[in-house]
Amino acid sequence: MKRRRFIQDFGWLGAGLGLIPACTMTPADTKPSKISKAENYFGEWKTQAGLPVFDYLIDQDADLNALWDPIDRPENRRHFHVIGNRALQVVASNRGDIGIFEEREGHRWLFYQDDLYGCGHSLILESGGVRWGSLYSDRPRDTIPLRQFGPTHFSVHSEYEGLKLERTILCPEGDRSWVLVKVQLTLSLDAEPRQLTHIESWPLRPRFLNTFQSDELRDKAALQVSYDINRSVQKIVAQEIFNEPAETIGAPATLLLEDLSPENSGQMSALEDDQWPTLQIETGLDLKPGDTQTLWFRVGRSTDEEISSPESFYEQQLNKVRSRVPKATSLNAPHVTREIPWHVAMLSGGANKDAILGGHTLNQSSVYGFGLGGNAAARDSLQHAIPLVYSEPHLALSVLRNTCTWGSPDGDLPYALTGNKKPLTQLLRPSDQNLWALWLASEYAAVTGDLAAFELPQQYHPDYSAASTTLKDNLKKQAYFFIDYVGRGQNGHVRILNSDWNDMVLQDSMIDKNSMIERGSSVLNSAMGSWVLNRFAPLMENLGERNTADLCRSTAHQLRELVAASWNGRWFDRGYGPPTESQPEGTVIGRDRCWLEVQPWAILCGAASSEQSRSLVEIFKTGHCMHSPLGARVIWPPDLSNSRVGEGTLGGIWYSINMTLIWATAKIDPEFALAQWEAMSLQRHGEAYPSVWEGTLSGPDAWNAPESPRAGRTWSTPAFSMQSFPVSNMHSHSQPVLAWLRLLGIEPTTEGTLAVRSSYEKALGSYVSSTFSASF
């Protein structure tokens, strides 16, 4: 797009602030863009057996809008979504196939799915050479099968001449490393009797995701895997053999395909292919009109767990999901009723039992986990666990302990873990990691009152060969590491090192990186640090660490005063750099443009006055949020000269930052805060960008703003592309839940207690889980 045309189209940018020239506008131009109220393009939401489910209804092969561009590989029509339990993730697609992924010993696929192929399907063979099944490519002619995505299940519903096939993949609750398959075949009353063979088919496709490894090297590593196949009456066991263990991850897995059907026992087989076998169970069936036959299978890691009644087990698992996920209500935002339980199911379904470090990891996922093969960053795992404190506190604690295990005995947390769970310390050296651990610990204690958890044994990463300590001492060391080692930089603010929350904050060509790393500072870290340390202090005090508590409080007070002094007359500065030859008075980041991430924290930590807070809200309304249906941009005004304007940190719309925006403004302008929560919702994305699949069930960490040529999608860089895996980023699930809790006025206090006090004048809504409830 030419610059002149761009300014004509987006001349409203910054006009309200006088920061960039306003173009001539008609009255219609000044109104917010109208959002379509059409039904979801791809299908419809409904409640089924007390749980939210989404019915995918379109014919993706014929629909022009189904084609999407992942940027780093060819365009395709595969729309996928991720569900899981606490041991694995299932990637299910509109093609009717799935993949099974886990992080037990590292990033690997037990059954790989990509844009071309997946695993796990039903094939039905009938007389006369009739062949059809659950794959979209095997659907009966002139039909569009229903594909249903549920909180922990995926199903395909197809029909041919009166014979209905309903195939469901269910992730059982807990740490089970396998899935349950239910195949139900029903013959209508007006059909002729049928003889058929059902084939349960699972091609073996291994895949290992060593960090930053090319597809070619990953292909090579997968080819180092062969299988030793053993068949018995009820199951096929496939034992992996690693012919070149250095190129794989973890120990060889023992996989199984097991027939759990109590009456219809099938015939086991393993079809040899050029690369790996396909595990199959063939079952012959005779159906009379009105008959229903149900077949049951188990697929995944081998297990000795007995399932005497798969039907009862299946119902028990659904009942557990219903009792586990929270319920929410709101007259103002009725879709909260489905979105809160949905988000929590997706969030807890992203957890993985960790066989190396213990506890559970909660990867940010999306392209970071499924593409790059990393668990990044430590802050993200900790951040995503915070809302789980209110529904699954034991899982939140498990994630806290697991993430603290990443670190070293001096209190340092690495930026990330590699695909084989090694600390990644060379890429980025962020300065905020410890704050997220202290925050999660403080919120956990305030909500549960469980102080005994902090006396539990706590390990360090095995690479450090260090003696274990307690969780309390680990967190205490992290606090001192943040205060003493990260320390202070320019103008007394917390040092920025080479990044803070914003990994790209030092990428501006006008910034001297070396001097910033040495002495540069982050007002964002100071503001967040002030809030966090003030909540961590009472936890330390309650654990008998008075000196640490006093240090945290005094540091929090100092930082709050420094943040207050960084007000530049319009907003709070973003950061400071030391004097250089080219900039003898020092560098100021965020004086010419309003960086959103620091502003809410300045309000939350108490640095912003009432007048400043109200002034900031007006800037948010007339700037960051203007004409943006999905919420506030991270920077305002955007740099129109940049080809990636409106993407990522160049003005994209970030879940993590907009959660703090909602939280902070809920105390000042509750109506605005609620509107921003709605902008964050799946409902809103479906209304604003109805033909974009991402945003229907899940999303990335950030959306592209309206000024981006790819508005409503997500960012891409020359290094890697979030657009290549634009769903299952845990920010898209954790932040709406935490923002809803904050709208209800639920947050930890400086006394170590929990506040429950909504600023909303009307009846806002409720949040009820098995462990916590609040309503207004």
Model-derived regions, located:
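An extended acidic
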Residues: 38-43, 47, 84, 89-159, ...
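Polysaccharide-binding surfaces and accessory modules of carbohydrate-active proteins
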Residues: 170-272, 281, 313-320
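Aromatic-rich carbohydrate-recognition surfaces in CAZymes
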Residues: 374-494, 523-526, 530, 651-665, ...
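Extended glycan-interaction surfaces of carbohydrate-active proteins
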Residues: 329-373, 400-418, 479-519, 561-655, ...
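Beta-strand-rich recognition/accessory modules
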Residues: 178, 254-317, 516-519, 532
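C-terminal capping/lid segments that line or modulate ligand- or cofactor-binding pockets
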Residues: 32-61, 74-99, 343, 373-376, ...
